[in-house]
């Protein structure tokens, strides 16, 4: 057994020397396999090669460690060495690998190559068992705790506890103070997350590393030199003479719309720019309290902000100087540069509401017909209503004429009314007025206008009195005839002349003439049906009314004859109208 151990040791020494490994015929696996005779025959060359290069080996100093990854050949050699030594003597196992230590071999076997190692996710039973064991042994004896968890090593249990199971771990969102502390600690320690975790209680090194790499490292460019991570809000006090205003981010004036900047040697140019629309409070330099000459400016205005920004030391160092500050703006002058040129900026404050309205009125008179003023809702008056005729044509006419602006085309802009209406009109009255004046209302829907000024006596209610009735047609007012069928054919006559004499109402194209005539024929047929259905009732009522008003002496026996006669006349008239319409459609 002693000879066998000596041969194995010599084989491992040979593997530690690259020159011996290339010259010797003994393979790495020869020391773990084969019979004793084979090893005995190969032992003399191994010992001679080891003695020949023993002087090249270092006898002192630290052991060189391989920094590269493990190759498949090294993994296979490690498996055989662990199997030979039963995984107990790691110092002898490490002697079989050049530039590998026993710690490297042990970790490689425990973390990677061990077939009993569990690399999957943690189960709830394992987490509960770790929590119970930590309560019993404390968060230090991880090798003892790992023995209770088959397939897990002490390092896995420790990382599971410190990164996930520890109740002191903070899993909420990162605060501003924590991020600022992380930035400061990273400047000191770099990527030493365990050291940084000591500065941030409740945050694990793993969570710190993830938060830094995911989001916080990208925000470093936005931090200023004063290490203020979050831009403070603008604080505006009532009296800025006593308390300074905290402005955000020391830098330059951020003007979204660049002002017009001209040099002083160019006369005749206006140095104006509106500062109310492009001043950005979030990017003004850190300002100092203003002097007494700027104290008259209104607090919180845009001019105040610009004046404070230009009074700061960072801006004064660039040769900028405030020439004058007033309520409507300020003037900034620059020192001459190396070329001898300087420039001036005049920043004007936003005008008040009254000044803006006055300027708009002045511009309206100067622009002439190019200006249009939008009327208010309470000033809009329905043109078609007759109730507003006095309001539009009364005393206000002279006032409106003074405000009207004639355009080159002869059109005028309607001026707004000077005052509101004194009488509030109801919705019904406005709708009725609009309906009566609507030109597209069909005449069949219009009511007959009756003279209701004086009551009609019973003696005047005769058939001849019906001549005072009127109905609307496209040709104008038409008198009503005394016959009952005239009332039934009123809507038919209101459709217009059938001979085509009136051309002003026919706006349809010629290809639609037939369809229009067919629709007219259908309308007449419907009216004939309606007239024949209500002929008896309507005719009897008119007949009785005329007989009673004229005090006729017709007897009861003559009434049926008169009724038949009137019925025949009505049918004849309606038949003529229908025949005329049919002939028109055929033509």
Curated annotation (Swiss-Prot):
Keywords: DNA-binding, Nucleus, Repeat, Stress response, Transcription, Transcription regulation
GO cellular component: a single term: nucleus
Compartments where located: Nucleus
Induction profile: Induced by cold, drought and salt stresses.
One Pfam entry name: Myb_DNA-binding
Region (Disordered): 14-74, 441-461
GO biological processes: positive regulation of DNA-templated transcription; positive regulation of response to salt stress; positive regulation of response to water deprivation; regulation of DNA-templated transcription; response to cold
Known tissue expression: Expressed in roots, leaves, stems and spikes.
SMART domains: SANT
Ranges of compositional bias, category Low complexity: 43-54
PROSITE patterns, sorted: HTH_MYB
UniProt DNA-binding residue ranges: 90-113, 142-165, 193-216
InterPro entries: Homeodomain-like_sf, Myb_dom, MYB_TF, SANT/Myb, SANT_dom
Primary localization class, coarse: nucleus
Domain HTH myb-type stretches: 62-113, 114-169, 170-220
Gene Ontology terms for molecular function: DNA-binding transcription factor activity, RNA polymerase II-specific; RNA polymerase II cis-regulatory region sequence-specific DNA binding; sequence-specific DNA binding
Extra remark beyond the main annotation: Plants over-expressing MYB3R-2 show increased tolerance to freezing. Plants over-expressing MYB3R-2 show retarded growth, increased tolerance to cold, drought and salt stresses, and have decreased sensitivity to seed germination inhibition by abscisic acid (ABA) or salt.
Function: Transcription factor involved in abiotic stress responses. May play a regulatory role in tolerance to salt, cold, and drought stresses. Transcriptional activator that binds specifically to a mitosis-specific activator cis-element 5'-(T/C)C(T/C)AACGG(T/C)(T/C)A-3', found in promoters of cyclin genes such as CYCB1-1 and KNOLLE (AC Q84R43). Positively regulates a subset of G2/M phase-specific genes, including CYCB1-1, CYCB2-1, CYCB2-2, and CDC20.1 in response to cold treatment.
Protein name: Transcription factor MYB3R-2
Organism encoding this protein: Oryza sativa subsp. japonica
Lineage, uppermost ranks: Eukaryota, Viridiplantae, Streptophyta, Embryophyta, Tracheophyta
């Amino acid at each position: 057994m002693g000879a066998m151990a000596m041969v194995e040791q010599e084989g491992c020494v040979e593997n530690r020397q690259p020159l011996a490994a290339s010259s010797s015929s003994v393979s790495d696996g020869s020391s773990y396999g084969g019979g004793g005779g084979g090893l005995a025959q190969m032992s003399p060359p191994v010992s001679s090669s080891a003695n020949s290069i023993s002087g090249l080996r270092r006898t002192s100093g630290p052991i060189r460690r391989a920094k590269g990854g493990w190759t498949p050949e090294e993994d296979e050699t490690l498996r055989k060495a662990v199997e030979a030594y039963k995984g107990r003597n790691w110092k002898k196992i490490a002697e079989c690998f050049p530039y590998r230590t026993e710690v490297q071999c042990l970790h490689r076997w425990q973390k990677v190559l061990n077939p009993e190692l569990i690399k999957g996710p943690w189960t709830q039973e394992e987490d509960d068992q770790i929590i119970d064991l930590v309560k019993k042994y404390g968060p230090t004896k991880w090798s003892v705790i790992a023995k209770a968890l088959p397939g897990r090593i002490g390092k896995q249990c420790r990382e599971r506890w410190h990164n996930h199971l520890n109740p002191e771990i903070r899993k909420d969102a990162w605060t501003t103070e924590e991020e600022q502390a992380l930035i400061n600690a990273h400047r000191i320690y770099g990527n030493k997350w365990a050291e940084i975790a000591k500065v941030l209680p409740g945050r694990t090194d793993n969570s710190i590393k993830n938060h830094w790499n995911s989001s916080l490292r990208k925000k470093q460019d936005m931090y200023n030199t004063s290490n203020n991570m979050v831009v403070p809000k603008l604080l505006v006090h009532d009296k800025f003479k006593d308390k300074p205003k905290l402005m955000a981010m020391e830098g330059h004036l951020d003007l979204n719309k660049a002002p017009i900047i001209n040099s002083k040697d160019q006369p005749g140019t206006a140095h104006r720019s509106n500062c109310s629309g492009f001043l950005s409070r979030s990017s003004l330099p850190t300002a100092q309290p203003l002097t007494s000459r700027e104290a008259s400016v209104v607090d919180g205005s845009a001019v105040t902000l610009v004046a404070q920004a230009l009074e700061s030391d960072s801006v004064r160092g660039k040769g900028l100087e405030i020439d004058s500050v007033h309520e409507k703006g300020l003037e900034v002058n620059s020192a001459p540069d190396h070329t001898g040129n300087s420039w001036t900026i005049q920043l004007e404050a936003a005008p008040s509401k009254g000044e803006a309205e006055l300027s708009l009125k002045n511009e309206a008179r100067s622009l002439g017909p190019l200006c249009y003023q939008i009327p208010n809702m309470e000033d809009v008056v329905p043109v078609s209503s007759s109730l507003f005729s006095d309001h539009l044509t009364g005393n206000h006419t002279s006032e409106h004429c003074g405000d009207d602006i004639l355009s080159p085309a002869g059109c005028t802009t309607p001026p707004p009314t000077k005052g509101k209406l004194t009488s509030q009109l109801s919705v019904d009255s406005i709708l009725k007025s609009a309906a009566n004046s609507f030109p597209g209302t069909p005449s069949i829907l219009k009511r007959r206008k009756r003279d209701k000024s004086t009551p009609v006596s019973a003696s005047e209610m005769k058939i001849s009195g019906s001549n005072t009735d009127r109905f609307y047609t496209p040709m104008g007012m038409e008198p009503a005839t005394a016959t009952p069928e005239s009332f039934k054919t009123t809507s038919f006559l209101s459709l217009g002349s059938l001979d085509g004499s009136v051309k002003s109402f026919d706006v349809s194209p010629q290809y639609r003439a037939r369809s229009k005539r067919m629709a007219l024929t259908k309308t007449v047929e419907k009216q004939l049906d309606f007239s024949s259905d209500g002929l008896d009732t309507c005719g009897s009522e008119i007949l009785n009314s005329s007989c009673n008003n004229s005090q006729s002496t017709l007897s009861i026996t003559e009434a049926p004859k008169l009724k038949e006669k009137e019925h025949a006349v009505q049918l004849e008239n309606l038949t003529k109208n229908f025949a005329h319409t049919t002939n028109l459609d055929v033509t």
